[in-house]
Amino acid sequence: MCFFENNQAAYFAKWLYFDSCDVEVVADTTFSAARKYLRNGNEQKRVAVLNFANPHYAGGGVEHGAMAQEECLCRSSNLYPCLFAPCAQAEYYQFHRNRVDHLFTDRVVYTPDVVVFKDDQPVPQLLPREQWFRVDVITCAAPYLGEPVHISPSDLKALFKSRIREICRVAMEHQVTTVVLGAFGCGAFRNPPELVARAFREVLQEELYRHSFSKVVFAIKSNGRPDDNYNVFSKVLGQELG
């Protein structure tokens, strides 16, 4: 299911309202964080995770052994074939291949009920059948700063906030109660983690979005360095949003 930049007026037909939103930063992987939440008495809750997409090719470099977040999601679930749906191929991947800039767009592919059937070790192992679980996946691309891009920090932050709002709106439209996010675009796409973390914080402080989810989890693997993405996001998002 594809969501375009210009169809936001159709949203909010059935969105939920929560008195407060619990925001947590955890040193974990995306699917592992979702699995732990679902196993903690929340099996009936609707959980969505953010897939940090390659906007040109479904699954990025999964067939070539790449180990970024999207590839790990594809190796552990049936997400990869789902991204070859005609709508996703035409309106997301081909659409972005036809563009010449590296900032990409706010377009989103929403895939409900993805089945996770492997763990997310470097070489994923099949889980026992009773440990399989389902999550919704929100596929969206961050701007890519690995190529020369002429954009000011303030404009980049505004772009991220627009994209984050779109991710939230799509999740809200599907009555997601818990969303698992992360250091969106702060790895191979080379976006500055503090700027991205502050963009997330400011959106989640807005009146609409602060009541949209019961829980928001930022799952970010830590490499132990004081300046790694996990620690930067923990510093920015680990305090009350107010």
Please give the residue ranges for each predicted region.
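Macrodomain-like recognition of ADP-ribose-binding/processing modules
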Residues: 1-179, 183-242
